[in-house]
Amino acid sequence: LDISLLNGYWEIQSVKQDNKLLKTYPFSGIIDYFEIKNGKGLRKKVMPKIDGKFEASLHKIDFNISQKNGKTTLEYIDKNNTFIETIAKLDSTELFITNKENYIYHYKAYEKLNFD
C-alpha cells in the first residue's frame, strides 16, 4: 500500500455496515483532508469554496500510521480518546476505511468545482 496516495482531499461517497448500505452522499459540502509526514498524519474537515480554495473547520485530529501483517492502520489521538481505522483499499481515485464497528467508509478523490 502506497500511503503517500492518502495525501490530499477525499470526498465521502457512502457508508456501509455488515454489507448493508447505510447512507450515500450524492454531494458533500465537507471534504476530508489528509496530510502524511514521517509516519504521522493529520486529518481535517474542509469546505470547498467557489474560488477553488478551501475553508478549514476547527475539526482536526492527528494520527500515527502503522503497517503490520499487511494491514495499514491509522491510530487517531484525540484529547481523551484513541481509536483505530484500517485502510482497506487506497489508490489514486478511491479510499476505503474500516473500523472496529464494521463500518466501511467509501471515499473518492475530490475533484475541484469547475464553473467554466
Predicted regions and their residues:
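Well-ordered beta-strand positions in beta-sheet-rich domains
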Residues: 33, 60-64, 82-84, 104-106
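N-terminal glycine/threonine-rich, aromatic-flanked beta-hairpin/loop signature
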Residues: 23-63, 69
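Short, solvent-exposed coil/turn segments at beta-strand boundaries
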Residues: 6, 33-42, 67-71, 88-95, ...
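Short, solvent-exposed loop/turn elements at domain surfaces
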Residues: 17-21
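Short beta-strand segments that buttress and anchor functional surface loops
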Residues: 73-78, 95-98
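Short, exposed beta-strand-loop hairpins at the edges of beta-sheets
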Residues: 84-87, 92-106
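C-terminal partner/receptor-binding element of secreted or periplasmic proteins
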Residues: 102-116
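N-terminal helix-cap/turn-to-beta initiation motif at the start of protein domains
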Residues: 1-11
